[in-house]
Amino acid sequence: MGQKVNPIGFRLGVIRTWDSRWYAEADYAKLLHEDIKLRNFLKKRLFNSGVSKIEIERAASKAKINIFTARPGLIIGKKGAEVETLKKELAKLTDKEIYLNIQEVRKPELDAQLVSENVALQLERRVAFRRAMKKSVTSALKFGAKGIRITCSGRLGGAEMSRTEWYREGRVPLHTLRADIDYGFAEAKTTYGIIGVKVLIFKGEVLPGQK
């Protein structure tokens, strides 16, 4: 089962926490849809900013959104002008008071979501899939990853029949719950169809008492 389950969902409550942190009873469905709408909007709006993760915290009439990005300067803008514009756009989607917290991803080479998006972007630019995979694997290991696995599925290289190719280096223990494994998924929209890119990065084991 470790092969099929989402590595982040599998570790929730053990070494990972939820990306949406709030509690609701009657309004649960409404707030869940609102979260999805906010995430989709931010992903589309900040497409070129290298957004890795979006966390949403809610309390009464306030919503705090933490955006983890590789390029915080693009989101913040000159003297914070871009952030203010973004806040106003988000306020139209929800009736809550919005607080934005922009956090920098120091090593984008070790962030599975950013790596998968980078590989997908290269595939869209017609870079050979093996070269794109190998390049990302090499740079992740260079920046201190203990192991990495990249999987590409679809009509690779414009082949008639779709297939799955993967490349792994180092250790990627999928069953070990204390293993800190980051997971990312992206889609490359090529002229032949969509190619799915999955990335698993093993950063080491989280021992009891550590965060």
UniProtKB/Swiss-Prot annotation:
**BP term (GO), one:** translation
Example GO molecular function: structural constituent of ribosome
Q: Which residues cross the membrane?
A: none
Return the Gene3D superfamilies for the record.
3.30.300.20, Ribosomal protein S3, C-terminal domain
Cite the entry's keywords alphabetically: Ribonucleoprotein, Ribosomal protein, RNA-binding, rRNA-binding
InterPro entries from the xrefs?
KH_dom, KH_dom-like_a/b, KH_dom_type_2, KH_sf_prok-type, Ribosomal_S3_C_sf, Ribosomal_uS3_bac-typ, Ribosomal_uS3_C, Ribosomal_uS3_CS
| PROSITE patterns hit by this protein | KH_TYPE_2 (PS50823), RIBOSOMAL_S3 (PS00548)
Ranges of residues in domain KH type-2: 38-106
GO cellular component terms, semicolon-separated:
cytosolic small ribosomal subunit
Query: What Pfam families would the database entry show?
Result: KH_2, Ribosomal_S3_C
Its biological purpose is as follows: Binds the lower part of the 30S subunit head. Binds mRNA in the 70S ribosome, positioning it for translation.
* Binding partners and assembly: Part of the 30S ribosomal subunit. Forms a tight complex with proteins S10 and S14.
Q: Which PANTHER family match?
A: 30S/40S RIBOSOMAL PROTEIN S3 (PTHR11760), SMALL RIBOSOMAL SUBUNIT PROTEIN US3C (PTHR11760:SF19)
Can you tell me which family this protein belongs to? Answer: Belongs to the universal ribosomal protein uS3 family.
Report the protein name in the record: Small ribosomal subunit protein uS3
